[in-house]
Amino acid sequence: MAFYSCCWVLLALTWHTSAYGPDQRAQKKGDIILGGLFPIHFGVAAKDQDLKSRPESVECIRYNFRGFRWLQAMIFAIEEINSSPALLPNLTLGYRIFDTCNTVSKALEATLSFVAQNKIDSLNLDEFCNCSEHIPSTIAVVGATGSGVSTAVANLLGLFYIPQVSYASSSRLLSNKNQFKSFLRTIPNDEHQATAMADIIEYFRWNWVGTIAADDDYGRPGIEKFREEAEERDICIDFSELISQYSDEEEIQHVVEVIQNSTAKVIVVFSSGPDLEPLIKEIVRRNITGKIWLASEAWASSSLIAMPQYFHVVGGTIGFALKAGQIPGFREFLKKVHPRKSVHNGFAKEFWEETFNCHLQEGAKGPLPVDTFLRGHEESGDRFSNSSTAFRPLCTGDENISSVETPYIDYTHLRISYNVYLAVYSIAHALQDIYTCLPGRGLFTNGSCADIKKVEAWQVLKHLRHLNFTNNMGEQVTFDECGDLVGNYSIINWHLSPEDGSIVFKEVGYYNVYAKKGERLFINEEKILWSGFSREVPFSNCSRDCLAGTRKGIIEGEPTCCFECVECPDGEYSDETDASACNKCPDDFWSNENHTSCIAKEIEFLSWTEPFGIALTLFAVLGIFLTAFVLGVFIKFRNTPIVKATNRELSYLLLFSLLCCFSSSLFFIGEPQDWTCRLRQPAFGISFVLCISCILVKTNRVLLVFEAKIPTSFHRKWWGLNLQFLLVFLCTFMQIVICVIWLYTAPPSSYRNQELEDEIIFITCHEGSLMALGFLIGYTCLLAAICFFFAFKSRKLPENFNEAKFITFSMLIFFIVWISFIPAYASTYGKFVSAVEVIAILAASFGLLACIFFNKIYIILFKPSRNTIEEVRCSTAAHAFKVAARATLRRSNVSRKRSSSLGGSTGSTPSSSISSKSNSEDPFPQPERQKQQQPLALTQQEQQQQPLTLPQQQRSQQQPRCKQKVIFGSGTVTFSLSFDEPQKNAMAHRNSTHQNSLEAQKSSDTLTRHEPLLPLQCGETDLDLTVQETGLQGPVGGDQRPEVEDPEELSPALVVSSSQSFVISGGGSTVTENVVNS
């Protein structure tokens, strides 16, 4: 009695608890029973349970043709195994398959049925009854589909270690073996799928997406893993929403508004088709287009979403699909289904009715109930499922499945169906291992084997964990330690078929889980059709891409993906799009105009090839040529008076120094090297000091001689050539010492200056010591200042005495140039520093060359008549007479004042300003050299009393004159000189006698004081000039003239053979001087 009571309790638990009727299952007896859980319907009808009566099981609605095909795949695999002699011979597999209706509650009802039929040791029911012979055990379960459903089922089956092999549940939570002890699956883990989604977004350079997930154990873990992967790739999520097929309208409206207001174009969805369908319907109703949907494998090929009327919203969807498999003979098996023939499949009747939209009457042989009315059914908006009640015609039973397009018959890509097929074969191979196990080699204690006829579920689970077999496609099948079967994904794109207008899934790439990171994803972009039938990759970024040359700048308060593009600063670059930072260019490089790369900095110096450098070089060469030309002219005409009058040896040295000055400017042109930097400043400084020293010595020599009170041979000897060269050497040696100290202590060197301008490297000379450079230039300016002082002081001396006036001008030019050089040098940089110094050198050099030598070259080449000894004598005598005239006038003024003080008449005082004018007549023949000077000075009365002889008259008529007119304000002094050939006769002896008598007299006339200097400028004759003053009070006397010692350096004396007349008029008095030489 107890035995029967126990059996009835278990049967009640099995049948009444599950509340499944005969037409809500597919079952077949066998030696070993396999359980199956499939979503034959998408959901259940909402029904209020007020508990006023016994609660009934909820009704399943919205038929799932794919779910029925998956069920058919399990039946096909079992029948194929039963008919195979190689696998489980002499054993028959049976099945019990239930509809989960895609809900946890229905799945648990079916699971309780599986559990109740097993021997439950934990309940200790064996003491009361043994029903195992009457109710066969379910040793494994295939299913379920959704991860949420499988999670609930796994929790229950895991309590009894009943193996569960899922074909579509990919949640990564199910890999936890501590919680789900008996769960295995033939589908990859969602962890790889989430990574693949992030890789696709990174591939298309999207960084601004939205996420939607099903509010279950599939959607939440999947989207969480995606967030982790997105964060690693700097992908920002604009919004994240949870949905469910049971969400109320308000929740759906909220999610739709979020999508509509979002700027993200790409939406990642981890959900199943039934959970996503209400949201898609509302989006279609609002006509929200332009979004790119990234679908997980749970809905990537869902018939609920992939409907033509939704294509304008979901067209272009990129989704993941499991790798398609091949099931030989499965196509024909699907076509054989018929409600009257498929006696073991209780779902065939409803399938037939939903396929042909008709109503089947129960036949005599069929198990179908007899209904006297036409059934209505809720359908899901299409011909197979709608929300309205419609009356259906009777089915004839002769309908052809091939004539109707349904997802059931779409076997082109067998993905989930193949996973079901593989799950059944996995269990079969585990049973085969038990069947073929040899004692001692088993997996159990002491190598024992399980008895195939009394096999238990936990034993099958043990063998499934160690399963390893080759499937019909030649692939190795094995479960890892987490019970997962690692596999690859196909990437599909939703297209609209041009033939029938249905949505087709085009394979556009794949994702290889086994490949290395970065090589897992392959996409053929040419095959992708985006939303709106566009071939262009859509833009889904919070900010536009920052092009090369810019970097991403953070916007405060915004996600990291929302940024502004900031141009790279000068000296930095970015050569990639969306660079997070700019790279700094190397030291000798600078960023280009677009900051996309680094280019070598421009090297800048005063080059030989640039126009400015060429111009300066030409001027320097011109200066060298002109200086060489002047030197050549001076050498060629070295014996002419004008060359001799300029102290030709010093002139040669001066011209050589000018050549050095012009040449030194060339060291400042070209790329600076260490040796040129060390050479150019000393070369410039020494050359200019040598030049100025020559001018200084020449000018000072003349000044000292003219200022001497009693010029004697001491002055001539002191200012000899040797001493002059010695002074030039000493002045130059000081500059050499400065340069040597400079080069020894802090030598200049070439320097690459990158601080002045960012884009240019200025190759300049680092002077080493600015103090040394200051000493060099300061010493040069000091000598120039002294030279200018002496030249200015001697500016009124005779022109032929080194042209002091022109030297003054040259020194003025020199100072103007170098004073202008200082601010210009200080305010310029780079190559212009060298250019300024070159210009200063050339300007100063040209000034010295032009002022000192060009006038002489002009006279030598174009006015040879002035390049005579007579012209030199005239100039010298003119200066002497001007000095004498001043002295005479001063004495006249003194006598007048003295007479006025004694009561005499007074006259006006002449002005102190004096001007002179000289006129030279025909050139004189050059006199022969005289060894003895024979001047003669006669008084005015003697000149009038002594008659002239005929030769003297002729000579007086022919001899040339040099006239001078001196103006003293209100007074005028006019004098004239004439020169004649010296005669070695009695007349010369008589003149000598008169000269001796005149030398005995004491005279203070200034003319006599300058007389010894006359030979310094005269070429080859001696000069004898005596002026006797009459009509003036006071004694008349003169100093004795020293002898000429050096005939080459000192010119011979002149013989004055005509009268010298001075007319001095001042106020009411006139002073006349006549000097007659014959």
UniProtKB/Swiss-Prot annotation:
Changing F788C: In HYPOC1; leftward shift in the concentration-response curve for the mutant receptor; cells cotransfected with both the wild-type and the mutant receptor show an EC(50) similar to the mutant; a gain-of-function mutation rendering the receptor more sensitive than normal to activation. Changing T145A: Abolished calcium-induced G-protein-coupled receptor activity. Changing F881L: Found in a patient with hypercalciuric hypercalcemia; likely pathogenic; mutant CASR has a right-shifted dose-response to extracellular calcium concentrations; activated by a higher calcium concentrations than the wild-type. Changing T100I: In NSHPT; Abolished G-protein coupled receptor activity. Changing G143E: In HHC1; decreased G-protein coupled receptor signaling pathway. One of its GO terms (cellular component) is neuronal cell body. Changing F801A: Abolished G(s)-, G(q)- and G(i)-mediated G-protein-coupled receptor activity. Changing E127A: In HYPOC1; increased G-protein coupled receptor signaling pathway. Ca(2+) binds at I81, S84, L87, L88, T100, T145, S170, P188, D190, E231, D234, E297, Y489, G557. Changing R886P: In HHC1; increased localization to the plasma membrane. Residues 790-805 are annotated as: Intracellular loop 3 (ICL3). One of its GO terms (molecular function) is protein homodimerization activity. Residues 22-188 are annotated as: Ligand-binding 1 (LB1). Residues 189-324 are annotated as: Ligand-binding 2 (LB2). L-tryptophan binds at S147, A168, S170, E297. Spermine binds at D238, S240. Changing F788L: In HYPOC1; induces a significant shift to the left relative to the wild-type protein in the MAPK response to increasing extracellular calcium concentrations and. Residues 892-963, 986-1006, 1030-1055 are annotated as: Disordered. Changing Q193A: Reduced calcium-induced G-protein-coupled receptor activity. Residues 880-900 are annotated as: Interaction with RNF19A. One of its GO terms (biological process) is cellular response to low-density lipoprotein particle stimulus. Residues 637-648, 699-722, 790-805, 855-1078 are cytoplasmic. InterPro entries: ANF_lig-bd_rcpt, GPCR_3, GPCR_3_9-Cys_dom, GPCR_3_9-Cys_sf, GPCR_3_C, GPCR_3_Ca_sens_rcpt-rel, GPCR_3_CS, Peripla_BP_I. Changing E297A: Abolished calcium-induced G-protein-coupled receptor activity. Residues 699-722 are annotated as: Intracellular loop 2 (ICL2). This is Extracellular calcium-sensing receptor. The lineage of its organism: Eukaryota, Metazoa, Chordata, Craniata, Vertebrata. The gene is CASR.
